[in-house]
From Swiss-Prot:
Localization (cell): Host cytoplasm
Keywords carried by this UniProt record: Activation of host autophagy by virus, Coiled coil, Early protein, Host cytoplasm, Host-virus interaction
Keyword Secreted: no
Gene Ontology CC: one annotated term: host cell cytoplasm
Span list, region Disordered: 108-141
Protein name per its UniProtKB record: Uncharacterized protein K205R
Keyword Coiled coil: yes
Source species: African swine fever virus (isolate Warthog/Namibia/Wart80/1980) (ASFV)
Biological process annotations from GO: symbiont-mediated activation of host autophagy
Primary location group: host cell
Family affiliation: Belongs to the asfivirus K205R family.
């Protein structure tokens, strides 16, 4: 027979072994959970880095798009100003202007050396010579400040009646903003259907 004292120690050792096995299993489970957590955390960090990079890329693209939009808007304003200036001249003269670059100095008429003399030339093909209609300077090559404020420009291309109407309608506007408003007003109120049709045909070419 086993002595009670020896049996007690055997039972105690057996219980300790069982507890150690339980602790070892718990430690294994904890390590597995830790490994799983670390993998999940690393995946989260990787996804976060990817998301942060995507956000930065989107921000860069947005800034690039904004810069491109500002460039397009600036170019559009300049082109619109040129078109409106051409429309104003077309309304006065009724014919499109040749695309010839001229300066303000060239645009000013030179005094005639002899107003009494007339230039004569022999008629050709039995047709009587006629004085050609003088085309004004192509306003497309005036600067924006000249379009909007030049007295020479206004006197050369706008009648006094139209100048008075525009001054009254758009006294609170200046610069390119006023030019656009004047052009739109003249297109809507001053252009005939025939002139509008002519402009649309010209812009299709």
């Amino acid at each position: 027979m086993v002595e009670p004292r020896e049996q007690f120690f055997q039972d105690l050792l057996s219980a300790v072994d069982q507890q150690m096995d339980t602790v070892k299993n718990d430690i294994k489970d904890i390590m597995k959970e830790k490994t799983s957590f670390m993998v999940s955390f690393e995946n989260f960090i990787e996804r976060y880095d990817t998301m942060e990079k995507n956000i930065q890329d989107l921000q860069n693209k947005y800034e690039e798009m904004a810069a491109n939009l500002m460039t397009v808007m600036t170019d559009t304003k300049i082109q619109l100003g040129a078109i409106i200036a051409q429309l104003e001249i077309l309304m006065i003269n009724g014919t499109p202007l040749p695309a010839k670059k001229t300066t303000i100095k060239e645009a000013m008429p030179l005094p005639s050396s002899n107003t009494n003399n007339e230039q004569t030339s022999p008629p050709t093909s039995g047709k009587t010579s006629e004085t050609p209609k003088k085309n004004p300077t192509n306003a497309m090559f005036f600067t924006r400040s000249e379009w909007a404020s030049s007295d020479t420009f206004r006197e050369k291309f706008l009648t006094p009646e139209i100048q008075a109407i525009l001054d009254e309608q758009f006294a609170n506007k200046t610069g390119i903003e006023r030019l656009h408003a004047e052009g739109l007003y003249m297109w809507r109120s001053q252009f005939s259907d025939e002139q509008k049709k002519m402009v649309k045909e010209m812009m299709k070419k």
